[in-house]
């Protein structure tokens, strides 16, 4: 299961990975969250995203090919239960009985 190909990065993420250092250089001491925020602003303002969209499309094609190969070699698919695992729900807590209820039950036991 660990050999399953990872999903490809979006055009934005590909661009952000390449632009991250220059954003940090322009804004020394900037927080990671602020880098992402500034990156989002720059990405929205960018006019020509075709270079990054083409890279993302190629990455998606490579991913689709790798997934087909993975499944052809016996890898599990989502239909076979290979989807995301759900967390186990915590066990429900049993309500504690009040002292009065406990003494009432004790009385019932004694009468039998």
From Swiss-Prot:
Protein known as: High mobility group protein D
DNA-binding region(s) in UniProt: 5-71
Residue positions where Phosphotyrosine is found in the record: 12
Family listed: Belongs to the HMGB family.
Biased composition (Basic residues): 84-98
Modification Phosphoserine, positions: 10, 103, 111
Subcellular location: Nucleus; Chromosome
Gene of this entry: HmgD
Main location: nucleus
CDD domains for the chain: HMG-box_SSRP1-like (cd21994)
Record field: compositional bias (Acidic residues): 103-112
Keyword Phosphoprotein tagged: yes
């Amino acid at each position: 299961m660990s050999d399953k190909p990872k999903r490809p990065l979006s055009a934005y993420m590909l661009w952000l990975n390449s632009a991250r250092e220059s954003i940090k250089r322009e804004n020394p001491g900037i927080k990671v969250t602020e880098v992402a925020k500034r990156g989002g602003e720059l990405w929205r303002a960018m006019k020509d995203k075709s270079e990054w969209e083409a890279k993302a499309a190629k990455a998606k094609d490579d991913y689709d090919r790798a997934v087909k190969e993975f499944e052809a070699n016996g890898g599990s698919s989502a239909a076979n239960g290979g989807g995301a695992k759900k967390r186990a729900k915590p066990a429900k807590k049993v309500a504690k009985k009040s002292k009065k209820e406990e003494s009432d039950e004790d009385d019932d036991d004694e009468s039998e």
